[in-house]
Amino acid sequence: MYIEKIQSPADLKGMDIKTLNIVADEIRQAVLNRVSKHGGHVGPNLGFVEATVALHYVFNAPKDKFVFDVSHQCYPHKVLTGRASGFLGDVDDMNVISGYSSPAECPEYDNFEVGHTSTSISLATGLQKARDIKGNNENIIAIIGDGSLSGGEAFEGLDEASELGTGIIIVVNDNEMSIAENHGGIYKNLRALRESNGSCEHNWFKAWGFEYKYLEEGNNIEKLIEVFESVKDTDKPTVVHIHTEKGHGFAPAVANKEVWHWGMPFHFVFRSVEQPKTIRNIQ
């Protein structure tokens, strides 16, 4: 398996799209292996596998900084940062790996101890300000789900990012869900953006002063790489709005998104993934 050999995101750099998709499939299997034995967040992680692979392919962590909101969707990130054993081994191996981002566990790649909703943008603006004071040039990327956007601290973070006016990338992982369905005025605009492929007249993010990119195919690695490449090294506050499917790749989690948000251990048969005989660079 590729993921048994990946020790850092740099190991993705020489892979072509076919191989990256195999890596994504292996990660999905590994996530299911862990949650089936240990319990944990199912749907949020499965829906963000491809985006995580694309983010780590395009950006250069640990120089570039990722901040995960709640961080319940960070399992794929952990697999790609040298912690695959916590997803492939037995329960004792899994107990070593937290279900959330943890600097104590991996200070190089986990920037904050997180577990609450709506915090990622404000935390990222702290990194943004510190970078600007130091005169550095790393990318700061906040990842937040549509469900977390209704939290007050998310509003504060958007306000501060816009006020600072320098480079920050906010990836809005829009799966049309929080734990359950979303309700409220924000979600009417998100729906209008989805239905218009990001082109509707009233754009909540542009009103805040953000550059804005929309991607309908939020579980397509090739398309994700293209949109992330287009905003890499930006010097402006930028939102990348991706439409994903919660539970993607696991039919029970897609069929019942609320039930499969988090789960106790369940029966799951781990399957191997066919690998190509050669690896070609994506270029």
Predicted regions and their residues:
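Glycine-rich ThDP/TPP pyrophosphate-binding loop and its adjacent helix/strand module
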Residues: D110-I282
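Solvent-exposed, non-transmembrane amphipathic alpha-helical segments
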Residues: G40, G47, S71, Y75, ...
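Generic structural signal of hydrophobic/aromatic residues within well-ordered alpha-helices
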Residues: Y2, I6, V31, Y75-V79, ...
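Short hydrophobic/aromatic-rich motifs at helix boundaries and adjacent loops
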Residues: V23-E26, N95-Y100, C200
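Cofactor-binding active-site loop characterized by glycine-rich and histidine/acidic residues
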Residues: H41-L164, I282-Q283
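N-terminal amphipathic, basic-rich helices that act as targeting or association modules
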Residues: M1-T81, W204-A207, Y212-L224, T238-H241
